[in-house]
Amino acid sequence: MQSNIENVSRDYAKILQSADLEKEINPLCTNIEDMLARLDEFETLLASVRAESNGMMANNVCSILGFTDSFEQLKARIDGLEQCVGVVSANLSEVERSVDIAEEELHVTDYSLKGLLLKPLKAKLSASDTSTLSSLPRSNLVEEEYQPVEIYKSDDYFGKSEEENYVAK
């Protein structure tokens, strides 16, 4: 048993003597040095980005704060536009309702050119009967006169433009 241990120890000694540790460790050291150099470059780049970002933030925040009045005006204009869009939507609904009533009064169901021109004329000729007129549920006429739908005025929401003021003078 003692001889086996000595044989094994000699074999291991030969392996250790034949192994060139410097040859195996040098590539690892080189890789570690490369990684440290890259890490240093990254740290420098990160510091540069931080400094630039801080400078930009300081300059831009001051500029943005300088536009506060303009932002308030823009906000007021956007609010006016939203109100205008709401009123336009309501006006459009009223105009559509008025058109529907007019189509009912003229008995228009055919939207071709022929239908739009001839059908109302035929309906007027055949509608001389008063019972037909009394059966119509709604009308755009007040005292036999057409009443147009009142629509919005953009000046109410945006004011007159400088161009319109110049033309008015």
Swiss-Prot record:
Please state which protein family the record places this protein in: Belongs to the BLOC1S4 family.
**Chain ranges passing through the membrane:** none
Entry superkingdom: Eukaryota
Function, please?
A: Component of the biogenesis of lysosome-related organelles complex-1 (BLOC-1) involved in pigment granule biogenesis.
Quaternary structure, per UniProt, is:
Component of the biogenesis of lysosome-related organelles complex-1 (BLOC-1) composed of Blos1, Blos2, Blos3, Blos4, Dysb, Muted, Pldn and Snapin. Interacts with Pldn.
The UniProt gene name for this protein comes to: Blos4
Cite a single GO BP annotation. eye pigment granule organization
| Phylogenetic placement of the source organism | Eukaryota, Metazoa, Ecdysozoa, Arthropoda, Hexapoda
GO cellular-component terms in the record?
BLOC-1 complex
Q: What is this protein called?
A: Biogenesis of lysosome-related organelles complex 1 subunit 4
